[in-house]
Amino acid sequence: MRRNPRPGSAASSHNHTPNFYSENSNSSHSATSGDSNGRRSAGPELGEPDGRMARGSSCGEPALSSGVPGGDTWAGSSRPKLAPRSHNGQTACGAATVRGGASEPSGSPAVLEEQLNLLPILDLRQEMPPPPVSKSFLSLFFQVLSVFLSLVADGLVCVYREICSIRFLFTAVSLLSIFLAALWWGLLYLIPPLENEPKEMLTLSQYHHRVHSQGQQLQQLQAELSKLHKEVTSVRAAHSERVAKLVFQRLNEDFVRKPDYALSSVGASIDLEKTSSDYEDRNTAYFWNRLSFWNYARPPSVILEPDVFPGNCWAFEGEQGQVVIRLPGHVQLSDITLQHPPPTVAHTGGASSAPRDFAVFGLQADDDETEVFLGKFIFEVQKSEIQTFHLQNDPPSAFPKVKIQILSNWGHPRFTCLYRVRAHGVRISESAEDNAMGVTGGPH
């Protein structure tokens, strides 16, 4: 809205006024720049001298820098920048002019007229509305809307992916179920049904009852099997014992075919004073050996008995020992026989306790002061269980006693066992009648 000059003004309109406003509007449009706060800056007017540029600051307007006259942009040159001015009120010079020209004339009347013509422009600047903010609000709204739509799109993508994964899982489970069902039906058709399979369906109680009854039957069968196993074991043991008795009975027969003077049934005995002590198992410490009425260890006289079953032997400690046998009379000794069970029959699985190296001595008198060496021999446990050794009794001599000295065994570290010892020869009678009859002894 433009204002005309007041009637009392010293300046009057003339033909130059339209051109001034047209040029002023063009220059102001080109020189005015708007900022975000709605303020504008006006450039220098057309035809304004250089002194006006310098005096602009005195009237509240920004001073113009020196340049092209008129302050307009010509031939593409840039217009000088102006300092910002306040749009909230009039300048001091303009206010003084409106109130009746109280201010002093700053120059020529043409300058005053130009200042008065600038008042409508100043009024228009004061009445200009604030810049619209609809553009910034719409841009903010669209930004929020775009962010919201992007979040919604991301959520929809996640939901779609979950749906796809669930669909894939459902498809896999379905295919697996179909495969298992086909496999089950194939097994049912391929495997023939059992002949004894019950056709009717059993209840849970009936099933438990049958399982319990079958369990009892199994327990009974196990008890019977254990009983049969014990019986078979006992039968085998009895059979083995009977076979062993038969074998040793055959062995105990007069296999040597020579008289035995070291037999307890014909009067032979053991001289305990000159015989090694019995073996006592100190590791196990047999309880029955401590009782006087029961002695588990066999005495030395067992070697004078024909019973040579495994375990029925005389054992002495270590691998060296001796035994002295009283003969039933004076006997011209010719042979000595040792008997030991074979390793296959021994309970320990071997014959390491059998004697190996031994020597035989003949005792001349009852005081046993004189010993006659009759030979040294080796008992080969792997050859035969009965082995006879010829004595070196030449010329033949009669002895009332015979000593068997064991020098070593077959490797047992704790004891040595003697099962049976036989003494062969000719018994010499001490009476004169026998001497007259010319009884001579010799080996048989």
Curated annotation (Swiss-Prot):
Organism annotation: Rattus norvegicus
Chief location category: membrane
- In the UniProt record, what gene is named as encoding this protein? Spag4
GO MF term set: identical protein binding; protein-membrane adaptor activity
The record's annotation in PROSITE patterns points to: SUN (PS51469)
Name this polypeptide is given: Sperm-associated antigen 4 protein
Quaternary structure annotation from Swiss-Prot or TrEMBL = Self-associates. Interacts with ODF1. May associate with microtubules. Interacts with SUN3 and SYNE1; suggesting the formation of a LINC complexs; a SUN domain-based heterotrimer of SPAG4 and SUN3 may associate with SYNE1. Interacts with SEPT12 and LMNB1; during spermatogenesis.
The job of this chain, per UniProt, is described as:
Involved in spermatogenesis. Required for sperm head formation but not required to establish and maintain general polarity of the sperm head. Required for anchoring and organization of the manchette. Required for targeting of SUN3 and probably SYNE1 through a probable SUN1:SYNE3 LINC complex to the nuclear envelope and involved in accurate posterior sperm head localization of the complex. May anchor SUN3 the nuclear envelope. Involved in maintenance of the nuclear envelope integrity. May assist the organization and assembly of outer dense fibers (ODFs), a specific structure of the sperm tail.
InterPro entries in UniProt:
SUN1-5 (IPR045119), SUN_dom (IPR012919)
Q: Which GO terms describe its biological process?
A: cell differentiation; spermatogenesis
Per the record, where are the segments of Low complexity compositional bias? 19-36
> Per the record, a Pfam family?
Sad1_UNC
Coiled coil location = 204-241
The answer, when asked if Transmembrane is one of the entry's keywords, is yes
